[in-house]
Amino acid sequence: MSSAAPIVCLAGPTAAGKSAATLALAQRWPLEVVNVDSATIYRGMDIGTAKPSPAEQARVPQHLLDIRDPAQSYSAAEFRADALRLIDEIRARGRMPLLAGGTMLYYKALRDGLDDLPQADPALRAELEARAARLGWPALHAELARLDPATAARLAPNDSQRIQRALEICTLSGQPMSALLHGRQRAADATPHRYVTLSLEPSDRAALHARIAQRFDAMLAGGLLDEVRALRARGDLHPGLPSVRCVGYRQMWAHLDGAVDLETAREQAIAATRQLAKRQLTWLRAQPERLVVDCLAGNASGRVVDRVAEILAD
């Protein structure tokens, strides 16, 4: 595969059919998948992340699956370094790298580089998570509002991951994150590649919502609750961790904690998945170079294959 060929980013909201499209592409090209997903990186979290099955992984080489224990974190900076390395390695084997997944922050880091902000500090992060477990994220959001009003104003009081990062930056740098971003400098080693986003998007939002509900019910039937129960039984995991905050896992965790009944947890998980899909679509529609395939159309995977052929021939 030529190093000058564009790299296809197969993106789309959750439940859009990216996995099926990936398998269709693998029948046409000798590809390897670089997963762009902040949930499938975790070992022992298979059902609720819709991780490719062992049979699917046997058909198509997959990268960045099962690379972290759920007690560990994985940053956008780590993803960027891993993805750039993998792209070069895959091309050196004469194969085609395909970026596939729905974590838009990872795509942004890969395309645009990273802000020159302090690296994560595990000790400080653990301290913030402990305080949040004791006081709640709205209390930490109020603290952020005093330190960095501009950043706090654009974050929801329960946006734990972003509140945590903003407080971390304030503490480590002594400056508000908003001030640092205002005069930010992107990493000098901008990516040498051209990325083309091929986005699976629904022509009917209600139909996607129905898919989301059906898929989550299938996860429950497939053993999601037992999967979360096993994670919880370890004793070293808690709801402040990025792994446990994943959609579906945090709602089932709350149910096992006795906070809500199973039906309420199910409804909350489906609603959270819909909200995630909405955020993913909002980000995708702002991308300058984006080709769209209706994920609800007949033979959507075949249409993806046709569009990729056009991209590579361009």
Curated annotation (Swiss-Prot):
Substrate binds at T14, A15, A16, G17, K18, S19. ATP binds at G12, P13, T14, A15, A16, G17, K18, S19. One of its GO terms (biological process) is tRNA modification. Disulfide bonds: none annotated. The record marks T103, R125 as: Interaction with substrate tRNA. It holds the Pfam family IPPT. Its cofactor is Mg(2+). Its EC number is 2.5.1.75. InterPro entries: Dimethylallyltransferase, IPT, P-loop_NTPase. Gene3D superfamilies: 1.10.20.140, P-loop containing nucleotide triphosphate hydrolases. Keywords: ATP-binding, Magnesium, Nucleotide-binding, Transferase, tRNA processing. The keyword Nucleotide-binding applies. It catalyses: adenosine(37) in tRNA + dimethylallyl diphosphate = N(6)-dimethylallyladenosine(37) in tRNA + diphosphate. Residues 37-40, 161-165, 245-250 are annotated as: Interaction with substrate tRNA. One of its GO terms (molecular function) is ATP binding. Belongs to the IPP transferase family. Monomer. This is tRNA dimethylallyltransferase. The gene is miaA.
